[in-house]
Amino acid sequence: MIGVIDYGMGNLYSVSKALERIDAPYFVSEHPDELKRADSYILPGVGAFRDAMEILTENGLKTFIQAAANEGKPLLGICLGMQLLFEESEEHGASEGLGLLKGKVVKLKDCDQAGNRLKVPHMGWNLLKVHRDSPLLPKAKEGFAYFVHSYYVSGIEEEALLASAEYGVCVPAVVGLGNVYGAQFHPEKSSTVGMLILERFKQFTQEQKVKK
């Protein structure tokens, strides 16, 4: 059973519909006591990093997510939810993240190294380069994913970078170590590759449950 974490800043409808399409058992909740019964978690997110962390802290979800991840339960952050997995962000001033992965969230540059102008936010389809096999994505599976973001993760550990996209810089697109994973793009809006990630997260959840 996948617990979709509701803290008022996630696109819950599209995530829920995507999970229904792959017949993944799930429920949506904002309460840590209810979320405890889940075998894994999806942390969606749209909006500002600082606002999200303030809400997660106030609702007791910050410590709950950290504890669940440390217990080994699979966790998938989507878009802002992926950024929240990291140590800190510079968006609207420095603010602390969940600290489950190493790296800092910084603003995308409005030009590439050759001086060509780039639109920020990065919005639309972009090609994924898959760097290594992972529970979420096989190395041979490359394709296009749908992005909407103005910030990206810098200083990520090499082994945590599973797939990237180019947008003036190398943008970490799929990240993960151990049981903690994230997608900067929206899997639920990203056609074949996106649905594959959700399907494999469903399988990963089942595999981890069996191990216990």
Swiss-Prot record:
Subunit details: Heterodimer of HisH and HisF.
Annotated pathway: Amino-acid biosynthesis; L-histidine biosynthesis; L-histidine from 5-phospho-alpha-D-ribose 1-diphosphate: step 5/9
One Pfam family from the record: GATase
Subcellular location: Cytoplasm
Record-linked CDD domains: GATase1_IGP_Synthase
A single GO BP: L-histidine biosynthetic process
Keywords: Amino-acid biosynthesis, Cytoplasm, Glutamine amidotransferase, Histidine biosynthesis, Hydrolase, Lyase
InterPro entries: Class_I_gatase-like, GATASE, Imidazole-glycPsynth_HisH
Reaction catalysis annotation: 5-[(5-phospho-1-deoxy-D-ribulos-1-ylimino)methylamino]-1-(5-phospho-beta-D-ribosyl)imidazole-4-carboxamide + L-glutamine = D-erythro-1-(imidazol-4-yl)glycerol 3-phosphate + 5-amino-1-(5-phospho-beta-D-ribosyl)imidazole-4-carboxamide + L-glutamate + H(+); L-glutamine + H2O = L-glutamate + NH4(+)
Its EC number(s): 4.3.2.10, 3.5.1.2
Catalytic residues in the record: C79, H186, E188
Protein name: Imidazole glycerol phosphate synthase subunit HisH
GO cellular component, one term: cytoplasm
Function recorded in the entry: IGPS catalyzes the conversion of PRFAR and glutamine to IGP, AICAR and glutamate. The HisH subunit catalyzes the hydrolysis of glutamine to glutamate and ammonia as part of the synthesis of IGP and AICAR. The resulting ammonia molecule is channeled to the active site of HisF.
Domain named Glutamine amidotransferase type-1: residues: 1-211
Molecular function as annotated in GO: glutaminase activity; imidazoleglycerol-phosphate synthase activity; lyase activity
